[in-house]
Amino acid sequence: MKKSARSVATAVGLGCLAALPTVAQDLASFEARLTEHRLDNGLTFLIYERPGAPVVSFYTYVDAGSAQEVAGITGLAHMFEHMAFKGTGKIGTSDYEAEEKAMAQVDAAYHAYDRERRKSGGADPEKLAQLERSWKEAREVAASYVVKNEFSEIIDRAGGVGLNASTGADATHYYYSLPANKIELWAYLESERFLDPVMREFYTERDVVMEERRLRVDSQPIGRLVEQMLSAAFIAHPYGYPGIGYMSDLESFSREDAVEFYDTHYSPNNMVIAIAGAVKAEAIIPLLERYFGRLPAGPPSPPLRTVEPEQIAERIVRLPDPSQPLYAEGYLRPAITHP
């Protein structure tokens, strides 16, 4: 039997109305299992009780990403994400007191090398080579105290899965899952890595990120096109920066820059942690207070100052490349928080 468009639309509309109570019930059921808890230091927890499999998933949201970078340190938000897996003063080291002194020597050697490299009149090749050797030797001494991958191996041995992180323009995300009886282990590890992160093997990891850029951007036509497109779309706002950073910045920023980024943006009032799985909120809140209450409160991240000027004409990017043709089209839209 043939139905008119109006009758079909009416039937669909009635079906949607009939489904509304079910949707409302599902939402009410979800909200009944959700607990929001805020610590005195500003850190907010969202706890979703989902009985069933004895597994709990954890998601840490940090309200800072590549948009919080400034010229000269692009890629630093992503770089710190890598550093957050390197351990603490207690995890990832065989002798932290000695390692800390060795890292200070690495910093001093790097800055001496960097100053010579940047001389406006040109570097002395022989002196630069000697300074680079000294920097390399200092890194080798610091590396001798490192217990590699200890943070992730603790999680693996405890049955953890999905350990990972990602950095976007507006936020950085950390996540993994553990058996439900390992919640206290998670609370210790997660609070410890944001209470006392150690930027060990910084320059070695910086080399890893530089190689990541070569693979994802420099050697990929789509990567090169997207980078140019974003730069054209945002001529003033840091959304125009590549999240992975410009190569010249990756070659130049220092361990102290990463520490400063952490100090500025990783205060607990700039973070939200979601916990979902076989948990009871009232049972774990004291645990959260005990471990995460150690994080000192700090000021909120500085707001972005730069406002993107109004676009008054179409912007076109053409990128000649010996590859298959690629086409991309983008439109500016209001922020997700816009009323």
Map each language-model feature to its residues.
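Bacterial N-terminal signal peptides
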Residues: 9-19
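Active-site recognition of the HExxH zinc-binding catalytic motif
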Residues: 74-82, 86
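M16/insulysin-pitrilysin zinc metalloprotease superfamily fold
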Residues: 87-89, 176-205
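N-terminal secretory signal peptides that target proteins for export/translocation
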Residues: 1-4
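Non-catalytic beta-strand/loop surface segments
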Residues: 23-68, 92-181, 215-270, 281, ...
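Short amphipathic alpha-helices in soluble, non-transmembrane regions
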Residues: 188-192, 286-291
